[in-house]
């Protein structure tokens, strides 16, 4: 399935046969987080079982997926942000304030770019385990994506809550989908519970001062909702 899609991960495997489908799950492929199963599953299996044979079996799944994202990125100038295409974002999150909405409030470009970094990083690590010299390419790619995320989403050690990604292709598609399906505009934000947690969990901040500020803001967000996730 992945080979037929030039390396993109399908939403379903096997891909269902459809005729004149309008459902984007049936007509699209290659979205962050969902598609990143291609790197997360082999990485997690290796961490638990340390089986290099199994890792080698699924290594192309990892490299093909990251290569597909990289090619899309390069075709748009090599900006090292995944701020283009159709994204699920923080799917089914409850913080948009719109009843019945499947769209969360978190900037989908932030989520997609973070997972671009994570998948490149995981792929580099697994290639290193197998002593494959391709690891350097993915390590460098992960470093470049991480640096771009920090440059885009931080001003010094302060979180930038009005980044350029709020005017990105991803955001325009997201708002168009919200209008088409519900006639609403989504209040997109960076400092959501999800946005803050992703940045903290994966070390996507410039320094420890920034880290502490993110952690404090996440605690405030939790307190605002009486300890509940949104």
Where would I find each of the regions flagged by the language model?
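Active-site core of glycosidic bond-cleaving carbohydrate-active enzymes
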Residues: 1-230
